[in-house]
């Protein structure tokens, strides 16, 4: 469907694996956030304290994503093309596309990390599963997929613009997630009392 689709697929196969390696740390922070928030609520902490802990976990995730994203973005144009790409015999065009993909991933990794910790960790950990699901799924189906399809399949703008459409999901999730976080409505005590 797109010009250079063979190179795009080869680049995506490699970039996707490198992205998955970076995602391990992001998901670890998100899972930890869920545990910490659930513990704070379960111990009967007041809403202001739980809110502050949620903000702290989101900030930690943002910092983690910023460090990993910087490492990935710099690596995409320095050591990955010389040390990793040759192992997979990527063509020069596929190497360039892989570096572009990894740069997009790196630039938006801090935002993605924040969103994961906020939605999967803080909101779900606070018992706000319904809002977390809506914030997580809606931008994918109403923003990212339609924009990526429009840019790539209808307008045929190329893989750069397809990635612009894909990462737009993270921007929408950020604003929806921040709105929900600031509302404080996500703090729900879902613990059960011990039977007497």
Regions found by a protein language model. Give the residues of each.
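Short helix-kink/termination motifs in transmembrane helices of multi-pass secondary transporters
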Residues: 3, 74, 78, 145-146
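Helix-loop interface residues and adjacent transmembrane-helix termini in multi-pass membrane transporters
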Residues: 3-6, 125-127, 154-156
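Small-residue-rich hydrophobic transmembrane alpha-helices
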Residues: 9-77, 113-132
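Short runs within selected transmembrane alpha-helices of multi-pass transporters and secretion channels
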Residues: 26-30, 104-125, 131-140, 147, ...
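Hydrophobic alpha-helical transmembrane segments of integral membrane proteins
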Residues: 34, 142-143
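Short alpha-helical transmembrane segments in multi-pass integral membrane proteins
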Residues: 37-108, 151-196
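Hydrophobic alpha-helical transmembrane segments in multi-pass integral membrane proteins
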Residues: 144-152
């Amino acid at each position: 469907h797109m010009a250079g689709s063979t190179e795009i697929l080869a680049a995506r196969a490699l970039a996707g694996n490198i992205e998955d390696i970076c995602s391990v740390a992001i998901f670890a922070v998100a899972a930890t956030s869920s545990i910490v928030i659930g513990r704070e609520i379960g111990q009967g902490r007041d809403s202001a304290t739980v809110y502050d802990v949620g903000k702290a976990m989101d900030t930690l995730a943002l910092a983690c994503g910023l460090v990993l994203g910087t490492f990935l973005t710099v690596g995409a144009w320095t050591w990955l093309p010389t040390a990793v790409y040759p192992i997979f015999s990527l063509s020069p065009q596929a190497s360039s596309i892989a570096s572009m993909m990894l740069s997009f991933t790196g630039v938006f990794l801090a935002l993605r990390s924040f969103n994961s910790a906020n939605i999967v960790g803080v909101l779900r950990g606070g018992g706000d599963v319904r809002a977390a699901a809506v914030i997580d799924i809606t931008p994918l189906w109403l923003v990212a997929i339609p924009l990526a399809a429009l840019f790539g399949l209808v307008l045929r703008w190329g893989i750069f613009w397809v990635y612009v459409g894909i990462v737009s999901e993270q921007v929408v999730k950020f604003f929806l997630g921040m709105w929900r976080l600031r509302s404080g409505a996500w703090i729900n005590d879902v613990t059960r009392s011990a039977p007497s």
